A protein has these predicted regions:
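Basic, amphipathic alpha-helical segments enriched in Lys/Arg and hydrophobic/aromatic residues
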Residues: 223-290
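Polybasic low-complexity intrinsically disordered regions
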Residues: 29-36, 43-47, 80-84, 88-196, ...
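Short hydrophobic "helix-edge" motifs at membrane interfaces and signal-peptide entry regions
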Residues: 65-66, 101-102, 172, 223-225
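DNA-recognition alpha helix
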Residues: 52-68
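DNA-binding alpha-helical recognition surfaces that contact promoter or target DNA
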Residues: 53, 57, 81, 238
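Basic, short loop/linker segments at the boundary and entry of helix-turn-helix/winged-helix-like folds
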Residues: 2-47
């Protein structure tokens, strides 16, 4: 556990430094905490706790303050405020954690999932108030390679999946050579948009389809083996929601975007640590055979 924590702290601190993160936000502040310490605490909070209060109570009983040189335990309001401030830096770190692992050519998949924004039970609302409460959902589009999240886009109001993908596409630092999508991606304009960028587009064609040069090519010879890699999206959606929750605790849009960014940093960080652990086990296993 301590080794994983030290590795994760080192990775996070190095990537935060690459973003030009200042040591302190203000010259005249008390200088109790350095900015990078808040970033690391927020990632650990999203990994191990469900609320700021729980994290503040959990933190003194761990080795984390010693590992990051913490002078005092921050309060809940400070952590909440810092998460919103650090959002652009954390969004960049989420991709920098994966960037060194990406090959020159790779297959990525995109898919949309939903996160609940209201935790009230419709049953009890009906029972007490006599009226049903409309459930709120945030739409979250993921771009995935293997078990890593390369990009994401969140919307609280309805927006088309392909339009969301085009929005997040601008923020992706390294584009895939092939993109797989479900039947929602069966659109000739969408295929042509990717082809203009030199990217191969794969999506199952709907029954009765006749039009479209790229769609007809997919009907004649559909690359099923490559398309099966889209199952990784379902795995990532399940693992992410199972580990970090299927709902958003923040109430404002700014807070929700910051919450998603921190959770994705934590997800990519521990996915990379687990991959490193498997690699070390394989090296040790191969060494025993010689």
């Amino acid at each position: 556990m301590s080794t994983d924590w030290k590795r994760s702290i080192k990775l996070l601190r190095n990537n935060l430094r690459k973003q030009g993160l200042p040591v302190y936000w203000h010259k005249n502040s008390p200088h109790t905490y350095e900015v990078w310490q808040h970033g690391i605490m927020l990632v650990f909070y999203r990994r191990y706790c469900d609320s700021y209060t729980e994290f503040v109570e959990w933190l003194p009983n761990t080795k984390l303050p010693e590992y990051i040189g913490l002078k005092a335990i921050p309060d809940e309001g400070t952590l909440c405020k810092e998460e919103k401030r650090l959002r652009p830096f954390l969004e960049a770190v989420a991709f920098l954690l994966v960037l060194p692992l990406l090959p020159k050519h790779f297959v990525a998949g995109a898919d949309m999932t939903g996160l609940q924004t209201k935790r009230r039970s419709a049953y009890y609302i009906k029972r007490i108030l006599g009226d049903y409460s409309r459930r709120g959902f945030a739409r979250l589009e993921f771009l995935v390679w293997k078990k890593y999240i390369l990009g994401w886009e969140m919307r609280l109001l309805h927006k088309d999946e392909l339009a969301m993908l085009k929005s997040l596409w601008k923020k992706v630092k390294k584009k895939p050579s092939t993109l797989v999508y479900d039947k929602k991606g069966d659109c000739e304009d969408f295929h042509e948009w990717l082809e203009e960028q030199g990217i191969r587009s794969i999506a199952p064609v709907r029954k009765g389809a006749r039009r479209g040069r790229i769609r007809r090519k997919l009907m004649r010879n559909f690359p099923q083996k490559t398309y099966n890699k889209r199952n990784r999206n379902e795995n990532v959606n399940y693992v992410f929601k199972n580990r970090y929750g299927d709902s958003l605790s923040a109430y404002s849009l700014k807070g929700r975007r910051a919450e998603i960014a921190t959770k994705i940093v934590a997800y990519n960080l521990w996915a990379r640590l687990s991959a490193l652990l498997h690699e070390l086990f394989n090296i040790a296993g191969n060494a025993t055979h010689f």
